[in-house]
């Protein structure tokens, strides 16, 4: 089980990313637009830098929903490989079966 503080930190980052998503996208659009002047572009870059660091979606970590494990998380299920295997062995995931060839 992951530390509760680490899980809480990721939840906080997700909330911040949602809150600043539109503003961040507007600024990135201005920066990448070829028709904007250099002054406008530079002002947008400075505004983007003043936003909270944790508001960037890149800083979020995929974590297992049950254990909070940060590594080996399967996106399709939102669970770590260990919990997916346990659930599959109990038959709790429809359509998923152990491979044999």
UniProtKB/Swiss-Prot annotation:
It comes from the Bacteria. The keyword rRNA-binding applies. It comes from Histophilus somni (strain 2336) (Haemophilus somnus). One of its GO terms (biological process) is translation. This is Small ribosomal subunit protein uS14. Binds 16S rRNA, required for the assembly of 30S particles and may also be responsible for determining the conformation of the 16S rRNA at the A site. Pfam families: Ribosomal_S14. Keywords: Ribonucleoprotein, Ribosomal protein, RNA-binding, rRNA-binding. NCBIfam families: PRK08881.1 (NF006477). PROSITE patterns: RIBOSOMAL_S14 (PS00527).
